[in-house]
Each structure stands twice: as C-alpha cells, then as structure tokens.
Amino acid sequence: YLPQFHCIPENDKWWGKGFTEWTNVKKARPLFEGHRQPRRPLNNNYYNLLDDGNKTWRWQIDLAKEYGIFGFSIYHYWFNGKLLLEQPVENFLKDNA
C-alpha cells in the first residue's frame, strides 16, 4: 500500500508544492500501442488520505474484502533516519478501522 496520496513538506520541497502520487498519475502517458495511460480513478476520486478521517481506508478495505483480499502491505518511507508519510497509517491504527 502506497501512502503517498497526501502532501508533506518534504515532497513540497523536493518535487514542488502540492506533490503527491496523483501528480505522477495525472502526467502518465502511453509508452506503446494498447498502453492505456493515464489511468484516472473512477469518478475523479483523487482522494487525500488525510482529508476524510478514515473514510478512504474503510472504503478501500471494504473493496478489498469484496474481492477476496484480506490484508495490506504498507510501504514505509525513511529518509536520513526520519520516517515520512506515516500520518495516514497512524490515523488508521488509532481509529481501529
């Protein structure tokens, strides 16, 4: 699970203000015939993992269960000994979602 769907000061500094993985999704281009890019989320649901409490987590968990997925592997970012992009996971764990 990639938790980079919200802004953090480090990404603003390194990649430009407002950068998230949605920035990369939006600028994707096809590389070969039949390569469908960019792949936009249904109903333009460019969610922010910090904006809606754990509503996005709950929606994704329910969708995963519906298709027989019962766990997530969550990527952790460490830069120079500092944990980054941790807030969505911390919010999730506090809420027992």
Describe the residue ranges of each PLM region.
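Glycan-processing catalytic domains of CAZymes
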Residues: 1-97
